[in-house]
């Protein structure tokens, strides 16, 4: 996005990573916001501040944490952990829509192929992703025919640190056979930012 001349506002709970990005890019290219995406006060304050920079053209909701266990091993903490992604998606979407006056904005919900099927040992994670899909589909119906465009993205199997706490489920060797995040991001962005008079509403991307 920055390479295409966009001003990007990035949100993360990782202050160290945000400091690295802030050092890498000038203020007119990147603004960092550090906090909990499920903290409503933080969301409201952040969106209000971002809106002072100009109209918000694109919101990308990409947060999520995995929990891979056999069905009987799940506890309440696992459910809460997975649901943070859904709650954050809703809060950021609502505040962004308000800030934009529900006009001229594209919202990309980055979910997972787990939102399209049931996977063994991912019951709670799948339940959360199906919830995100349901929310996204409802938004698409609510804003059909308007200048609010909602895009559902379902990528599956990406070579990142996402699986670092689940090595009994996805080994490091297996992880490295998954999609690379760079080319995946390029494919997603190609569909999100272009001059064509169309919107690709659903994108499912599977590894080879």
PLM features: residue spans?
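Conserved glycine-rich Rossmann-like NAD(P)H-binding loop of the short-chain dehydrogenase/reductase
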Residues: 6-18
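Rossmann-fold scaffold of SDR-type NAD(P)-dependent oxidoreductases
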Residues: 56-64, 85, 109, 151
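Residue(s) in the substrate-gating loop at a strand-loop-helix junction
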Residues: 112
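C-terminal helical subdomain
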Residues: 148, 152, 172-208
């Amino acid at each position: 996005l920055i390479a295409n001349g966009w001003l990007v506002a990035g949100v993360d709970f990782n202050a160290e990573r945000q400091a690295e990005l802030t050092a890498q890019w000038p203020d007119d290219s990147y603004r960092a916001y550090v906090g909990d995406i499920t903290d409503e006060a933080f969301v409201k304050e952040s969106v209000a501040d971002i809106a002072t920079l100009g109209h918000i053209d694109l919101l990308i909701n990409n947060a999520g944490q995995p929990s891979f266990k056999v069905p009987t091993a799940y506890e309440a903490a696992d459910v809460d952990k997975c649901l943070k992604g859904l709650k954050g998606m809703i809060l950021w979407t609502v505040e962004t829509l308000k800030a934009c006056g529900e006009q001229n904005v594209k919202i990309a919900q980055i979910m997972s192929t787990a939102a399209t099927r049931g996977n063994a040992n991912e019951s709670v994670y799948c339940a959360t992703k199906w919830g995100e899909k349901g929310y996204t589909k409802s938004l698409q119906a609510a804003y059909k025919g308007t200048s609010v465009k909602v895009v559902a993205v379902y990528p599956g199997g990406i070579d990142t640190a996402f699986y670092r706490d689940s090595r009994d489920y996805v080994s490091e060797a297996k992880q490295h056979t998954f999609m690379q995040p760079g080319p995946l991001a390029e494919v997603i962005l190609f569909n999100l930012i272009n001059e064509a008079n169309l919107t690709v509403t659903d994108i499912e991307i599977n590894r080879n």
